[in-house]
UniProtKB/Swiss-Prot annotation:
InterPro entries linked to this entry: Trp_synth_b_CS, Trp_synth_beta, Trp_synth_beta/beta-like, TrpB-like_PALP, TrpB-like_PALP_sf
Segments crossing the lipid bilayer: none
Protein name: Tryptophan synthase beta chain
Organism lineage: Bacteria, Pseudomonadati, Pseudomonadota, Gammaproteobacteria, Vibrionales
Primary gene name: trpB
GO CC list: cytoplasm
């Protein structure tokens, strides 16, 4: 059977204990077969449509761009069942796991969105589900923890390291290496060991495919730029995939600058990391002078990741995509602005992409441009975090 490319340029690969290689090989073969099976594809597309609610809307911002010559559209992944883009690829991987005869699903989660999406897919498809989550993230995302439990998932707190996403990833991988005969590791982003970055991209590419059709319908042309936030990078690669060959469309990824790139409190490895091996892949990584993984930081739990998917690293290296960053404060401003001006409360992750678009518009208000921001999720999970921050600032 032909195999998928394990690398994107120099990035990617499969840096895992030998015991996991057969499991990854089996997964790759099953994925290639499923991609060529019309019955599998139909089942996946039907679930996206009739269960998850695709296609999602492409919404023109009515008020945010007043007084400028920009048209700004939002790709509304916040309207997807489960509240974020995560549901797309989780349904794909869960179907794939079932096809492979697996009975259990292991997952990791940061903001809890991937955990919720995994829990709902497992409930729907009759699979047992256990989710590893950093103890710190469990504290800041309690509504999502309860959602997972409601849908029958077991949530396992991780107290090691920084008690956040990277530690949950390590524990999930450790579990899988002991249980892969009966369990599938449902990785939540377009990163990790091959073939995960490719599988996740292919199950997310519907975002960009729909956007292309919708924008041509509404505007008669492709956008000047598509903009998405980047933690591990799955919502961004889902938006970018169908536009990579459209050379006139700029691809812009937005990393979290946290408290500022001049501090240690950020999560921007693409621009401020060094090449390293982490989470089964070779990719830019936040490291200290001894090569140890540095803690990343972002106000948004879902972007709080010290590395980035290998295809993003490659797109950055060859100059096909550009990657900027946005601070906590800029993201919080965009979060409030979208709520006030358009009546849409975005996820803090998505607010980073919106903030970057607003900076582009502000820099050149007279420029005629057509922009699409991937609004990757809704902000229900973040209202308590934002409330506490604004309260502390005396803004409320």
């Amino acid at each position: 059977m032909s195999k998928l490319d394990a690398y994107f340029g120099e990035f990617g690969g499969q840096y895992v204990p030998q015991i996991l290689v057969p499991a990854l090989d089996q997964l790759e073969d099953a994925f290639i077969e499923a991609q060529q099976d019309p019955a599998f594809q139909k089942e996946f597309i039907d679930l996206l449509k009739d269960y998850a609610g695709r296609p999602t809307a492409l919404t023109l911002c009515q008020n945010l761009t007043k007084g400028t010559k920009t048209k700004l559209y939002l790709k509304r992944e916040d309207l997807l069942h489960g509240g974020a883009h995560k549901t797309n690829q989780v349904l794909g991987q869960a179907l794939l796991a079932k096809r492979m005869g697996k009975k259990e699903i292991i997952a990791e989660t940061g903001a809890g969105q991937h955990g919720v999406a995994t829990a709902l897919a497992c409930a729907l498809l009759g699979l047992k589900c256990r989710v590893y989550m950093g103890a710190k993230d469990i504290e800041r995302q309690s509504p999502n923890v309860f959602r997972m439990k409601l849908m029958g998932a077991t949530v396992i707190p991780v107290h090691s390291g920084s008690s956040t996403l990277k530690d949950a990833c390590n524990e999930a991988m450790r579990d899988w290496s002991a249980t892969y005969e009966e369990a599938h590791y449902l990785l939540g982003t377009a990163a990790g060991p091959h073939p995960f970055p490719t599988i996740v991209r292919e199950f997310q590419r519907i975002i960009g495919e729909e956007t292309k059709v919708q924008i041509l319908e509404k505007e008669g042309r492709l956008p000047d730029a598509v903009i998405a936030c980047v933690g591990g990078g799955s919502n961004a690669i889902g938006m970018f995939a169908d536009f990579i060959d459209e050379k006139d469309v700029s691809l812009i990824g937005v990393e979290p600058a946290g408290k500022g790139l001049d501090t240690k409190m950020h999560g921007a490895p693409l621009k401020h990391g060094k090449l390293g091996i982490f989470f089964g892949m070779k990719a830019p990584l936040m490291q200290d002078e001894h090569g140890q993984v540095e803690e990343s930081y972002s106000v948004s739990a879902g972007l709080d990741f010290p590395s980035v998917g290998p295809q993003h690293a490659h797109l950055n290296a060859i100059g096909r995509a550009e990657y900027g960053s946005v601070t906590d404060d800029e993201a919080l401003d965009a979060f409030q602005l979208l709520a006030r001006k358009e009546g849409i409360i975005p996820a803090l992750e998505s607010a980073h992409a919106l903030a970057y678009a607003l900076k582009m518009i502000e820099a050149e208000p007279e420029k005629e441009q057509l922009l699409v921001v991937n609004l990757s999720g809704r902000g229900d999970k973040d209202i308590f975090t934002v409330h506490d921050i604004l309260d502390a600032k005396g803004v409320l």
